[in-house]
Regions:
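Periplasmic plug
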Residues: 199-245, 261-266
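A short, amphipathic beta-strand motif
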Residues: 42-50, 137-138, 764
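A short, solvent-exposed loop/turn motif at the edges and junctions
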Residues: 70-71, 89-97, 104-125
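Short, ordered, surface-exposed loop/turn motifs in non-cytosolic proteins
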Residues: 53-76, 162
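Short, surface-exposed beta-strand/beta-hairpin micro-motifs centered on an aromatic residue
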Residues: 79-99, 199, 225
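Short, acidic, small-residue-rich periplasmic hinge/interaction motif at the N-terminus
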Residues: 49, 63-65, 108-112, 128-172, ...
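Short, polar/charged loop or turn motifs at beta-strand boundaries
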Residues: 166-189, 197, 202, 212-217, ...
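Primarily recognizes Gram-negative and organellar outer-membrane beta-barrels
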Residues: 75, 88, 220-223, 243-286, ...
Length: 983
């Protein structure tokens, strides 16, 4: 087989079409037999509440009696759990099946401490498709006040256990340092992974929402709660599949209305009144921090106020066991301030909910990146040395709200939002391209890149040098509103969903730069190109409107299908004008005008670079037809869940594009197939076994700008072109996992496999001019890109006393990256294929000794990289670390948290990056006033060896970047806790 045309595509487009045809036939068969599934059973549903408080009375006994002889026909318990975690549906809702026979009946409801209620129940004139009848709410009256004793269940401090479908983590079982926030706890949870962006995974599954006491606080911003909620307030962390408001409203699970959530449960004493903490401190190197976090809880409302300001970059605490590496640091030096408010109000009647938040954030970031890049080219590579110095200033305000109303036969969900951002960024950039590897030069020789005349040694292999200073400022805003309503039908289990949203965005951007390119030939400076430029990117605005209707047809209780139609219209209007100020006298190479200043409009308006200025207008119309087939089956020993979710989208997109050389209007019509969440899952009822297989298809149409056949020379070293023949790309994801849990032993393990190929991937292939270092990019469709993963992970305790526990993961990654790279003057570009194989391992052991703990940790990634070119030299690379962590209780009520880790790198092209860095952090703390005040001293990178190096690789080359990091420091800070209970 010719390796230049090799591709592994498990699902072709013809096969995908066959799948859709088979699915349609299946739906027809199901619909044809649907009526036979309506057996002679009528489901009665309702809810039981206290007459005075309107609070549910779960556990009430509900019976249906024959009105003629009072014989009991059916009975049930009004206790609903929805199969989604044991505590989120502790309600008195009930469902009960009776023979489908018209007549007069009596409903009897009883519960200890309440008077028995009797309700007449005439069941007359049953409709043909009426399979259930809603009896509404029945209120029970108390004959007298009863004092009920609270039941307290004491359990041993196991780290986690399963209760139904819910994983329950006991927060008190983890050894955490004084002053630790929620992020420290989440990092230690068995099976959990916490990314630096706040994204959480449990057993490889993405956590869609982070909840607080079952409420969706800080929606979409996990880091607010992770960075500000103290762990001393946390009782348990629960992970489960949560059903949404629509499922609760309808009394049945709605397709697509389930989210995988992590629910943080507070200790009982913090569930009412005001609770919070205040923290402040300062240290060496002008480090500082200040924090306020306060919450108020009542039985029907929650309010949170928070503020945070610091210049510490990293929220990690010494002695916390995790898989943190220096690359997780926020790049550079960051000074940020953040403040916000979050609220939630639930009506006691359950008829409405109000919630929302507002946040303002300011950040200054200074980052210096030193990058070495190897460019894979036919007949010999080239090598880049890049230094980027950026100072970014941003202010952002965001607010979103939710108004939810519930009526007898419909609900209404309204969500408005508004976001605004201002930015002012300064940048410095230096790029030197060589025909020889940087390994051949000393550091002092390479540093001459920044001088007016580069060193003689570099001149011999220099191709080009780019020096650029830039200033970018502007603002953006986006606002929108969505409305959704679910409508119930009185005599049918079916329901109708209506959805609409509208959004508007507006952006303004001013970009200034002084850009100089020196071209070299035969060891001499051959030519210099200097440009003083002003980009006026405004207006840039657009709007979008969406409407959707979906009808859910309930075939039987365990089988339903949802048919939907969605229409979206999006309009975008962009203007970008480029002015060449260097053509004015005194604005050229030796200009003294400060970057960001402009001459009069009359002076520069005629200097427009027409070839690289443009205005574009685009209108998209998308029609999406979807279906959602759900089947679930409960048995005595196992549960099955399966769903198929095919979508067919018809896109009609029109663009008008005009610049100095092109004035064109064109339309692209595309048919896209998508399958967002198709899966089959099996679980044992004892929760010891779980298997799941998922298949997703994500079809993406090419960006319309890529169809415009223009030659953009805005960046003389990176020229872009269009391609009118691009095809849609399809990413297929096949994911399978098996989980084994040992509840009594506190052990679990998981094995997961992933295979993710991309059909018709859009690659920005390029041809390279070795004489000037100029790249000319053109988008092309390529096949053969895919990646796969196989790993085994486990966590749990290792001894009977539960003092020794572990977390471990071992696996492999394989990635095949395909691109197109050619040389200037060659007719066609060659396929560049790079194969990357990585072996991963993580292991952490923790041993608990009374109120102290000590742990060992090790993480490693070992990779082998090969390519299809004859001149490609395969190489190996490794990143690994190992060390220990400890939380120690000392005399005089002192507590020490510390971690010592060796970070090692091997196989980097830049030999200075192949290093062994010992990083030591420590925290000494002491509580005062019964724990209300905690004083802490932190030492960060005490040995001063921390460095931040990242490496990326694809078919175009290898990039290694060293970023500046915060210098070592000591900081003294104190935290005061408060808890104000209502009288």
């Amino acid at each position: 087989m010719n390796k230049n045309h090799w591709a592994v595509i498990p699902v072709s487009q013809s096969v995908l079409k066959k799948v859709y045809i088979a699915f349609v036939l299946l739906c027809m068969v199901i619909s044809g037999h649907a009526q036979s599934q309506y057996n002679n059973v009528l489901v009665l549903q309702g809810r039981i509440k206290d007459f005075v408080t309107h609070v549910d009375v779960p556990g009430s006994k509900v019976e249906v009696l024959n009105a003629s002889d009072s014989a009991v026909i059916a009975s049930t318990e009004a206790l609903n759990e929805y199969q989604s975690g044991e505590d989120k549906w502790v309600t008195a809702e009930y469902w009960m099946g009776i023979p489908r026979k018209e007549g007069n009946y009596i409903l009897r409801v009883s519960y200890d401490g309440y008077a028995t209620a009797y309700v007449d129940l005439p069941l007359l004139h049953l409709y043909k498709r009426e399979t259930r009848r809603d009896l509404g709410t029945i209120f029970l009256k108390r004959p007298k006040t009863l004092n009920l004793e609270e039941v307290v269940v004491k359990t041993t401090k196991v780290k986690f256990y399963h209760k139904g479908d819910t994983i329950v983590y006991n927060a008190d079982a983890f050894q955490l340092g004084e002053g630790s926030m929620l992020d420290a706890l989440v990092r230690q949870l068995p099976g959990a992974e916490l990314g630096k962006d706040g994204r959480i995974y449990v057993n490889g599954k993405f956590v869609e929402s982070l909840l607080l006491n079952g409420k969706d606080f800080f929606r979409g911003d996990n880091k607010v709660m992770l960075d500000n909620l103290p762990t001393y307030m946390v009782h348990q962390v629960k992970v489960y599949d949560r059903l949404g408001e629509n499922s609760r409203f309808l009394g049945q699970e709605v397709a697509g209305d389930k989210r995988f959530v992590m629910d943080v449960q507070l200790k009982k004493q913090y569930n009412i009144g005001w609770v919070g903490n205040v923290e402040a401190g300062g240290g060496t190197k002008d480090r500082y921090l200040a924090r306020l976090f306060a919450m108020r809880f009542t039985d029907h409302s929650q309010l949170a106020i928070y503020g945070n300001m610091n210049n510490l970059n990293d929220g990690r605490k010494p002695g916390e066991g995790d898989n943190w590496t220096p690359s997780d640091l926020v790049g550079g030096l960051t000074n940020q301030q953040l403040a916000g408010i979050d609220y939630n109000i639930d009506a006691r009647s359950g008829k409405y909910q109000l919630s929302g938040n507002a946040q303002i954030k300011h950040a200054d970031n200074t980052i210096i990146d030193n990058t070495n890049r190897t460019n894979f080219l036919p007949n010999g590579n080239t090598f880049d040395r890049i230094v980027a110095n950026n100072r970014n200033h941003n202010v952002a305000f965001s607010t979103d709200h939710r108004l939810y109303f519930e009526f007898k036969n419909a609900n209404l969900d309204i969500k408005p939002y508004f976001n605004y951002q201002y930015f002012n960024n300064k940048s410095g950039f230096s790029l030197l391209t060589l025909s020889s590897s940087l390994d051949a030069f000393s550091k002092s020789q390479v540093d001459s890149l920044y001088t007016p005349m580069i060193g003689r040694e570099l001149l011999r292999s220099a191709i080009s040098r780019n020096l650029r200073n830039g200033l970018l400022n502007g603002h953006s805003l986006k606002s929108g509103l969505s409305v959704e309503s679910v409508i119930k039908f009185k005599h049918s289990p079916d329901h109708l969903t209506l959805y609409a949203d509208a959004s508007f965005r507006h952006e303004t951007e001013h970009n200034y730069d002084h850009n100089r390119i020196d071209y070299y030939a035969h060891g001499q400076l051959n030519n210099t190109d200097f440009r003083n430029r002003y980009f006026n990117n405004r207006p840039d605005h657009g709007y979008s409107v969406t409407g959707k209707i979906a009808y859910t047809y309930v075939i039987r209780r365990e089988l339903s299908i949802d048919f939907s139609y969605k229409y979206n219209h999006t309009t975008t209007d962009r203007y970008s004008s480029l002015y060449r100020l260097d053509q004015l006298t005194d604005w050229g190479t030796n200009t003294t005008h400060e970057l960001g200043t402009l001459p009069s409009v009359a002076a520069y308006s005629h200097l427009i670079d027409a070839a690289n200025s443009y205005n574009s207008w685009q209108a998209d119309n998308t029609h999406t037809f979807g279906a959602f087939l759900v089947w679930n089956k409960k048995g005595k020993k196992s549960e099955w869940w399966a769903q198929v979710v095919p979508n067919l989208s018809l896109l009609s997109r029109t663009m008008h594009y005009r610049n100095g050389h092109v004035d064109t209007t064109f339309t692209k019509r595309t048919v896209l197939y998508n399958m967002p969440s198709t899966l089959i899952r099996w679980k044992s009822t004892d929760r010891k076994y779980e298997y799941m297989f998922q298949y997703h298809v994500d079809g993406q149409a090419p960006d319309m700008n890529k169809f415009v056949n223009v030659r953009n020379t805005t960046d003389p070293l990176n020229i872009t072109m269009g391609n009118t023949h691009l095809l849609p790309s399809y990413k297929h994801e096949l994911i399978s996992h098996f989980i084994r849990t040992y509840p009594k032993k506190g052990l679990m393990w998981i094995v997961e496999a992933q295979y993710i190929p991309t059909v018709n991937a859009i690659a920005m292939g390029y041809t390279y001019d070795k004489a000037t270092g100029q790249r000319t990019f053109r988008p092309e469709n390529v096949d053969g890109n895919w990646r796969g993963r196989l790993f085994l992970g486990g966590a749990g305790v290792l001894n009977k006393r539960r003092t020794l526990d572990f977390k471990a993961m071992f696996g492999t990654n394989y990635e095949r990256s395909v691109d197109l790279i050619g040389l200037s003057g060659v007719v066609s570009a060659d396929r560049s294929v790079v194969n990357s194989f990585t072996w991963m391992s993580q292991l952490q052991l923790n041993y608990k000794i009374g109120q102290s703990s000590i742990g060992l940790k090790g993480n490693g990634n070992w990779g082998h990289v090969s390519g299809n070119r004859n001149d490609f030299n395969a190489f190996n690379v490794a990143d690994f670390n190992y060390g220990f962590i400890a939380q120690v209780r000392l005399p005089w009520d002192l507590r020490l948290g510390t971690d010592l880790t060796m970070y090692s790198r091997r196989g980097y092209k830049d030999k200075t990056m192949n290093s062994d860095d010992v990083v030591w952090n420590a925290r000494l703390s002491r509580p005062f006033f019964k724990g209300k005040l905690i004083v802490m001293v932190d030492g960060f990178d005490i040995l001063g060896q921390l460095s931040n190096v990242t490496r990326t690789m694809n078919a175009q080359g290898i990039t290694e970047t060293y970023s500046n990091v915060i210098p070592r420091y000591l900081v003294l800070h104190a935290t005061y806790r408060f808890n104000i209970m209502p009288h």
